[in-house]
Design a protein with these regions (language model features):
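Recurring C-terminal helix/loop segment of individual leucine-rich repeat
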Residues: 44-48, 68-72, 92-96, 116-120, ...
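Eukaryotic tandem repeat interaction scaffolds
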Residues: 140-230
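LRR N-terminal entry segment and analogous cap-like coil->beta motifs
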Residues: 30-79, 83-86
Length: 353
């Protein structure tokens, strides 16, 4: 009976102890192992925080810098939300104590570059969100140590360059979002090692050039979004190099140059059973001027007619020229034969006289 009487007191004391470790401006809930410090005016990381906290929300504050080993007292964190702050710098090893961290959200901040030590100690991370920052270059060292990452969102930055092997250690990555950046070309080696990638979003860039073998390593790709870029032409083998069971490709809102070559490419792609051009009916022509605004599917059967007619005209012209040459040669041959015959006759007459 005494134990039953003492137990509530112990629980109450434990709760008070937990709350005592909760910083001002935060709401700490022991049962859920979470601390909510969102939507405040925090300029520095709050302290203290319960050491058993697994979910920490610091979003929508005024944080500008994440120092070295910033979360040393909350090593058990699994989810860390730092989105919608003013963060412009992250020290090397800032997240290194968080060996159980699964989700890190740094979206909508002011981060311009990822240092060599940015990912130190984050081998357990499964989801990294860096959308709407100010990144311009992804270096080969940017994402080291992220061997178990499944989802990476880099959309709506200002990325113009992705170095070869920037994603080199991400053999488990399944979703990569690079949409809304400033990429102009995709070179071979950019997606090396992404054998598990299922979704690749590249929409809303300035891509006008794609190397033929750039998608070859993506042996699990199910969705490729290239809509809203600057593609005028595409090589058939660029997509043929995708050897997945089924890949859906989005290509609308590109300034296509509609000609016989383009028609042939899409006709061939349409015959490949594992490739699905989901928005083919929405593709429109930007060039030549007389086809501007027309849907490709409305004119695709006519694009090669002019070329065919031209080829026929050239062929007929060549045939006529050859026949005419043969006829002329034959006439000349006969003319020479008659002339020779007349000359021989004249010679015989002169001898007789």
């Amino acid at each position: 009976m005494r134990l039953l009487w003492v137990l509530p007191l112990l629980v109450e004391a434990h709760n008070k102890s937990f709350l005592h470790h909760c910083a001002i401006g935060c709401d700490c809930q022991e049962e859920l192992k979470q601390a909510n410090c969102a939507r405040g005016i925090l300029r520095h990381l709050p302290s203290p925080l319960p050491p058993l906290t697994e979910h920490l929300d610091l979003s929508q504050n005024q944080l500008s810098h994440i120092p070295w080993r910033a979360f040393q007292t909350t090593r058990r964190l699994k989810t860390l939300l730092l989105n919608d702050n003013n963060i412009s710098s992250v020290a090397d090893g800032a997240f290194s104590p968080l060996e159980s961290l699964l989700r890190l959200d740094l979206s909508r901040n002011r981060i311009t570059a990822l240092s060599t030590g940015f990912t130190l100690g984050m081998g357990s991370l499964r989801e990294l969100l860096l959308a709407e920052n100010r990144l311009t270059t992804l270096f080969s060292h940017s994402f080291q140590h992220l061997d178990g990452l499944l989802r990476l969102n880099l959309s709506h930055n200002a990325i113009v360059l992705v170095q070869v092997r920037a994603f080199g250690c991400m053999s488990t990555l399944r979703q990569l979002d690079l949409g809304g950046n400033r990429l102009q070309a995709l070179g071979s080696g950019v997606f090396t090692m992404l054998k598990s990638l299922e979704v690749l979003r590249l929409q809303g860039n300035n891509i006008s050039q794609i190397d033929i073998g750039v998608f070859t390593p993506l042996t699990s790709l199910a969705l490729l979004n290239l809509a809203c870029n600057q593609l005028r032409r595409i090589h058939y083998k660029t997509f043929l190099s995708l050897h997945t069971y089924s890949t859906h490709i989005l290509l609308e809102d590109n300034p296509w140059h509609c000609d016989c070559d383009l028609q042939r490419v899409f006709r061939k792609l349409g015959s490949v059973r594992r490739l699905f051009l989901d928005d083919y009916s929405n593709l429109s022509c930007a060039e030549p001027p007389e086809l501007h605004g027309y849907r490709l599917m409305e004119v695709d059967t006519e694009l090669c007619i002019a070329e065919t007619v031209t080829v026929l005209i050239i062929t007929v012209t060549v045939v006529i020229t050859v026949v005419a040459a043969i006829v002329m040669a034959e006439r000349k041959r006969k003319s020479r034969k008659k002339e020779k015959h007349w000359t021989d006759g004249a010679s015989e007459m002169s001898y007789d006289s």
